[in-house]
């Protein structure tokens, strides 16, 4: 089917490439979501991700900051960035999710990838373009959609190579258009909501430090009781729990994406003692850090 007469879409359509020898991975997911599947807390992963919204609007929470997004917006997420989508009640929201991973350490391509992926590391993670510029990107996505429907590409080196090269054309086009981004966050907050989102953003960038309710109260010139009450009201989380969840989510990421010692990860994620880290990790994850790492290795 066509959405807005210009975007090819089909429920539960996937484009998957898992080229293990060359460390190239793609996962295109055309599907719809509604409010019933909204995540409780933000998550993160070791690959790049693009959300292309095909519904009227939604919210994307990135490192504790909510971004209001509209149909045709692209949300670009670098590895290890904490985020979650918030879909609204009513009709399910169509969207395209693209996850991908490249071998970024190869000398012959590392500089090129660093440059072409720079939009994923910009301060503004949401991209909105004019109809003409947006159509340049949609044309490439439509080409990939049609190709995946007409070819038995999986496991065919030539077909997978075509998809890989076509998507790099998409990334380069996005890179060329990055300075024409017209997005501005039209999410409206009252003054206390704005302050609370500043606090949550601070937590995401300073979770490795010694932060607490008392510290944040002084940092943002808010009384502890007021901050505690309003933080829970705005985010749905107790402030101390939010800090611990942010630390544990980052610890989980490091456990499966690095070979660091568990004690080093605990320290880097802001825990004052290893026993405290173990206790909180078990409480949130339902397993020990060591078992969490082992299960991730077995599942690969």
What are the residue ranges of the model-derived segments?
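Ligand-binding loop in jelly-roll beta-barrel domains
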Residues: 80-105, 110
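Generic protein-terminus/edge-of-domain signal
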Residues: 1-74, 81, 89, 114-115, ...
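Short hydrophobic/aromatic patch on the recognition helix
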Residues: 72, 226-231, 276-281
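Regular secondary-structure segments
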Residues: 54, 138-152, 200, 204-207, ...
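Terminal helix-turn-helix DNA-binding modules in bacterial transcription factors
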Residues: 201, 205, 210-217, 222, ...
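Short, Lys/Arg-enriched, Trp-marked, Pro/Gly-tolerant hinge/linker segments that flank
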Residues: 123-135, 151-201, 205, 209, ...
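Aromatic/histidine-rich interaction motifs
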Residues: 112-142
């Amino acid at each position: 089917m066509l959405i807005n007469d210009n975007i090819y879409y089909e429920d539960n359509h996937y484009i998957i490439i898992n080229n293990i020898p060359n460390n190239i991975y793609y996962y295109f997911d055309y599907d719809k979501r509604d409010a019933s599947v909204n995540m409780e807390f933000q998550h993160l992963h070791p690959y790049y991700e693009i959300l292309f919204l095909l519904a009227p609007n939604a919210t994307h929470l990135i490192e504790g900051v909510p971004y209001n997004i509209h149909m045709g917006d692209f949300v670009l997420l670098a590895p290890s960035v904490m985020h979650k989508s918030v879909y609204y009640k009513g009709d399910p929201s169509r969207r395209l999710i693209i996850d991908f991973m490249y071998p970024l350490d190869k000398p012959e391509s590392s500089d090129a990838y660093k440059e072409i992926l720079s939009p994923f590391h910009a301060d503004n993670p949401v991209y909105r373009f004019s109809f003409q510029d947006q159509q340049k990107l949609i044309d490439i996505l439509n080409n990939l959609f049609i190709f995946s429907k007409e070819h038995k590409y999986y496991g065919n080196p030539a077909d997978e190579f075509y998809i890989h090269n076509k998507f790099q054309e998409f990334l380069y086009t996005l890179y060329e258009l990055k300075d024409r981004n017209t997005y501005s966050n039209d999410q409206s907050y009252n003054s206390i909501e704005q302050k609370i989102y500043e606090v949550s953003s601070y937590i995401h960038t300073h979770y490795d430090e010694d932060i607490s309710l008392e510290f944040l109260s002084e940092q943002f010139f808010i009384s502890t009781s007021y901050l505690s009450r309003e933080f829970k009201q705005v985010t749905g989380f107790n402030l101390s729990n939010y800090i611990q969840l942010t630390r544990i989510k980052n610890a989980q990421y490091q456990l499966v994406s690095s070979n660091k010692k568990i004690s080093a990860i605990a320290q880097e994620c802001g825990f004052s003692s290893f026993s405290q880290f173990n206790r909180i990790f078990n409480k949130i994850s339902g397993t020990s850090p060591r078992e969490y790492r082992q299960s991730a290795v077995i599942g690969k």
